[in-house]
Amino acid sequence: MISIFIAEDQQMLLGALGSLLNLEDDMEVVGKGTTGQDAVDFVKKRQPDVCIMDIEMPGKTGLEAAEELKDTGCKIIILTTFARPGYFQRAIKAGVKGYLLKDSPSEELANAIRSVMNGKRIYAPELMEDLYSEANPLTDREKEVLELVADGKNTKEIAQELSIKSGTVRNYISMILEKLEVKNRIEAITRSKEKGWFK
């Protein structure tokens, strides 16, 4: 019998997932929680075979919990609405065995759990495509400017550091916002982090 812990902050989905998996003859949901910390505490104490987690939960996220549980022997499966390459890359680094999207068919989750228990890794196909197809649209100089923005530097400081005029820096920032399809500098930094484009 495969023992499973589920961490999901949407109560209705948490209940539905638990009910669905308990219908499987070879699976038993032994615990449920609504935060990443719930998952960390339960897994360390009870050591279930599998832990299924959402990413965005109050307090500790699913990715932070996965990083903390990397060496416990529990197989982590991320189940999320976020098909973001940056999240996916971080999950892979954390040793996550499965990464599925919430719009996947329900039987796919049960099959993924069995596959993971057999030593396989199961990742949503569309994420694998995105991982290899989504290139950073920024030029090297634009990347340099954005990294300085992320370091908290203002237009004047960036101009001094790169030995260019403030107006040129503003032009670069306008191009960055346009290429990343965002409204401001904060969104540009967030988008680049999500895509895993920062060094």
UniProtKB/Swiss-Prot annotation:
It holds the Pfam family Response_reg. GO terms for cellular component: cytoplasm. Residues 131-196 form the HTH luxR-type domain. Residues 155-174 bind DNA. Coiled coil: none annotated. Keywords: Cytoplasm, DNA-binding, Phosphoprotein, Transcription, Transcription regulation, Two-component regulatory system. GO terms for biological process: phosphorelay signal transduction system; regulation of DNA-templated transcription. The keyword Ribosomal protein does not apply. One of its GO terms (molecular function) is DNA binding. Its main location: cytoplasm. SMART domains: HTH_LUXR (SM00421), REC (SM00448). Member of the two-component regulatory system DesR/DesK, responsible for cold induction of the des gene coding for the Delta5 acyl-lipid desaturase. This is Transcriptional regulatory protein DesR. It comes from Bacillus subtilis (strain 168). The lineage of its organism: Bacteria, Bacillati, Bacillota, Bacilli, Bacillales.
